[in-house]
Amino acid sequence: MQPEFWHKKWESNQIGFHQLEVNPYLQRHWPDLAIPVQARVLVPLCGKSLDLLWLAGRGHQVLGVELSEKAVEDFFHEQQLQPQVSEQGDFKVYRADAVELWCGDFFSLTMADVAGCTALYDRAAVIALPPAMRERYAAHLQSILPACRGLLVTLDYDQSQMPGPPFSVDDAEVQRLLGSVWRVEMLEQQDVLGDSWKFVQAGVTRLEERVYRIRGV
């Protein structure tokens, strides 16, 4: 999967993965993580998610990473924020209040870039990536952020019934990808097929969302 794939998705507004409301799993489970109010939270592959504002509204400093400059600019425009723009290594950084969006390749992110981040929120990052890239993503994420707490949201369905993205990432893969460095605990599992017409149309017969708590070992 090449960067152009995502650039075209954003340019053509094919962004069915974007949620028009704050994610309910985030609202339900984040408070139980006991993450300090002023903690810095890393949000990989963040798009223009409203979850960024929700996290900032709880007092957190939010560092989102997004490949598409259109997504980043749309976020600030739609939220009526005027960001300051600067360069940081390979990234173009947009800052407004407690939100920083780093526009560039997630795999270029370094440990120094995320210094101070003690929390992680992944709703649509790992499931956006095909298998080989998921391996790279998990390894890179754990190398730059070995000690953290946070939430991961995944989808699980029969991948043979529909091509991704979003891709299916089952519980065994979550444990294999992340369990060697972090403690990974499933908090919730929901059957969401009835709410997902795209999947039904494609012939998917089972669709589950899972929410995991992540803690550095």
UniProtKB/Swiss-Prot annotation:
Pfam family, one: TPMT
Compartmental location: Cytoplasm
SUPFAM superfamilies: S-adenosyl-L-methionine-dependent methyltransferases
A single GO BP: response to metal ion
Enzyme Commission identifier(s): 2.1.1.67
Positions bound to S-adenosyl-L-methionine: W10, L45, E66, R123
Main localisation: cytoplasm
Keyword Transmembrane helix: no
Record PROSITE patterns: SAM_MT_TPMT (PS51585)
Record key words, sorted: Cytoplasm, Methyltransferase, S-adenosyl-L-methionine, Transferase
InterPro entries: SAM-dependent_MTases_sf, Thiopur_S-MeTfrase_Se/Te_detox, Thiopurine_S-MeTrfase, TPMT
GO molecular function, one term: thiopurine S-methyltransferase activity
Protein name stated in the entry: Thiopurine S-methyltransferase
Species this protein is from: Pseudomonas fluorescens (strain Pf0-1)
